Swiss-Prot record:
Pfam families in the cross-refs: NYN_YacP
Protein name listed in UniProt: Uncharacterized protein YacP
Gene: yacP
InterPro entries for the chain: YacP-like
CDD domains attached to this UniProt entry: PIN_YacP-like
Domain of life of the organism encoding this protein: Bacteria
Amino acid sequence: MDILLVDGYNMIGAWPQLKDLKANSFEEARDVLIQKMAEYQSYTGNRVIVVFDAHLVKGLEKKQTNHRVEVIFTKENETADERIEKLAQALNNIATQIHVATSDYTEQWAIFGQGALRKSARELLREVETIERRIERRVRKITSEKPAGKIALSEEVLKTFEKWRRGDLD
């Protein structure tokens, strides 16, 4: 099984759409990222865990599941990088391949040492955009292949039905 660990605020700061949303609302940017990760998870079958720094919030770590994506807000004084390193170490085994999405160069080297593979923010964005295009194409194809609203009938059958409609039952 593949597991993707995502440095949430790193993606928000690197993806143009999310960066624009962040200017108005961090919460909206987080929600859109989680939604995109849910689509990614659904399409790839990979488990996805998005980690956000507690970001000036005091207290304990908070975990939640949103659209079947695991979301972790780190505890006070713990960075997303630190939490991702711990998760990568804890989840890594012979049956699991860990991927870490971050553009933080130091974090990339740290996770390499634990056997995890890295994806930059740009690589993950491209992958997500490719998946979105594939989903759109598939939806268009399925929609266009819907059966026609009418059943093709021969001219003779149409004439018979028209007679019946007019009450001529002979």
